Amino acid sequence: MAFANSILDALKDTLVVTAFGGAEQIPYLTVYAVLPMSLLFVSLFTKLSQRWGREKLFYAAIGTFISFFVLFTIVLYPMRSVLHPVDLSVQLLKWLPSGLRGGIAVFTNWTYSLFYVFSELWGDVVLSLLFWGLANETTSLHDAAIIYPLLGIGANVAQASSGFMMKWVTGSGNFISWDAKLRFLMTVVLTCGGCATLIHAYICDK
C-alpha cells in the first residue's frame, strides 16, 4: 500500500503541474477538493463501519479506488484531449479575474483533479484507516512493540523502492511514450491493490 501511495503521489503532482494552469491548481485542489472529500469520506466511513463491519467496508473502499484508477487509466486519461474543455477555459480566463486562474484550471483538467483527489485519499483512507485498522485488530498488545516498528520500516523501504522504480521508468528514454509509462505505473498500483485485497482476505480467513 505504501509502495502504491508513493507512485500515486508522484503521478498526481506530475499530471497537475504539467497540465493547463500548472501548479496554481494545487491550493484550489487542496482546499476545495481534497479537504471536503476527506471529511466526507471519513464521515461515510464512520457510518458504514457501524453497519457493515470492517471486512466488508475494506472491500468496498478499496474496490472504489481500484475501479476509479482502472477507469482513469483506460478511459479518462486516453480521452483527456476530448474531455478537457480547454477552449471554454481560455474564454473564461478573459472574462474572470486572473486570481481565479487556478480554479479554472481545476475545472478544465477535471480528470486530473479527480485523480489528484483519489490519490490523496488513498493515503488518508487506505493507509491510515484501512491498513492501520486491520493492524490494530489483528495485532495483540504484546506483539505490537515488535510488529509496529517493522511495519514502519517496511513502509519506508516501500517508499524508497518506489522512488527507484519511478526513476527507472521515467528515465527509460524517449523511445517509450509518457502514456505507456503511466499505464505501466498504474498497472503496478492496481497490482498492489489486488495483492492487498488478497492478503486481507487471507488474514480474515485465518
Model-derived regions, located:
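Helix-to-coil boundary motifs at intracellular loop junctions of multi-pass secondary transporters
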Residues: A19, R51, L134-T138
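Residue-level hotspots within transmembrane alpha-helices of multi-pass secondary transporters
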Residues: L39-L44, A160, F164
